[in-house]
Each structure stands twice: as C-alpha cells, then as structure tokens.
Amino acid sequence: MANFIKLNRKRTEQGLPATQIAYHCVFTGNPGTGKTTVARLLAGIFKELGVLKKGHLVETDRAGLVAEYIGQTAVKTNKIIDTALDGVLFIDEAYTLAQGGNQDYGHEAIATLLKRMEDNRDRLIVVLAGYGSEMKTFIESNPGLRSRFSRYINFPDYTPNELLEIFLKYLSKQQYVLSESAMAQTANFLTKEVGKAKNDFGNARFVRNLFEKAITQQANRLANIESCDKDMLKRIEEEDIIKSIQRT
C-alpha cells in the first residue's frame, strides 16, 4: 500500500491522474497477536504518507456501536465514526455485529458503517478484526462488506520462543531477571501451552498475565524479608514461576 501511495504522488507531480483505491483491511487472528498494535502503526503511516490528516486510531467493538433500543444504534455508530474521521476506525470482533439474527440491531450498525465509508471515503479507513473463519463468513455474507473489504492480513500465533522473548522484554523493561531454573521452567511451560492452544489463546496477553503473576509471587515470597538486596529484588526464581503457572 505504501508503494502505491508513493507512486500515486509521483504520478500527480508529473501531471498524471492519481488512482484512488480503498485502504480498508480485515485483520484475522487470535487475541494478543498484535492486530491493534499494527492498526495503530498503520494509522501513523497513512498520516506520514498524506492519506490521513490526523492518523489517530479509534478502537471499538459491538458494544461501542450497537444500542439496546430501536433507532439508537445508528446514532451511536455515527458518533464513534465521527471521532475516527481523518484516522482509522478499528472494530474488534466485528463478526459479532451479524451474529444476532435478522432482527438484531447489529445490522443497523453495519448499514450505518457502510454508508459513512462511502460518504467519507477520503477521511476514513476502517479495519475489521476477529478470528479468521468468523471474519471470512461475516464479510462474505454481506455484499456491501465484500465489495469494500478485499485486503486480508492474517496474524499467526506466536511461537514458544517468540512468547519467551516477549516475556523477557516485560521483565527487562521493569528491571527483573529470571534465574536459570526459572528460565527453563518458563520455556517449558510456554511450549506446552502453545501445543494445546485453542482459538481463545491470548498470545502476548497470556504472557503479560504470566508476567504479572510472576512478579506478584516474587513479592509474596520477599514481603517478610527485611534485608532484601538489589539482586533479590530483581530476580524471579523458579518457585515464583511454578506458583504463577499453578494460578494460570
């Protein structure tokens, strides 16, 4: 997309017509695989390339778009879209907008979104996110969605080594370190978790939760020790990881 935008700019500089294309995307993948982070980066890139004036990201989901009573969903959806103008609107678990049957107000949100995407096509980029199979069914079920969203980007689950690297980054950022045995215990645990992972596996979120549990267990272990030196305060021991795993 970036190359196309740059080339369009060069065409304009040479007096050639610029071709307009839709930049809307569908992000597929499990939770915690970086979809929101990439959407935020994408918004910034679009601003730098001159596609968007603000380049901010507005995150929402079904709850942010659908109201409880008839006639209110369009109003609610329009308010969210207004805040996203000149930026990117990120709708997480977008497929839930069409899961409530024909009488569900989610269809009103979809209709409102499609109209605003057309009316504000120069000021709004929409990213729909969710599980792969659900998103494909969702997009294919609606001609309006199908005609506007043809760009799919899949976010695969992290490997055990990648999850361990993320875990270590969380530790390093807060000046914690793992003992050698704690490192082995963590690596073994993550390998097992990835092996049995299902669609609801949290990936980076899962690792973040493990990190928070580990430092909590360390605090519990050291709380009654008066003479804690700097190394003790930094080091996460194997028993901290074991107790964290037991609570996961």
Please report, for each region that a protein language model flagged, where it lies by residue.
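Conserved catalytic/switch belt of AAA+ P-loop NTPases
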Residues: Y95-V127, S133-K136, E140-G144
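Walker A/P-loop
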Residues: P17-G55, K79-D82, F149
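Flexible beta-alpha connector loops of hexameric P-loop NTPases
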Residues: R62-T73, T96-H107, Y152-N154
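Short glycine-rich substrate-engagement loop in P-loop NTPases that contacts/grips substrate
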Residues: G55-A84
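Conserved C-terminal "switch" segment of AAA+ ATPases
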Residues: L49-K54, E134-E140, R146, F155-D200, ...
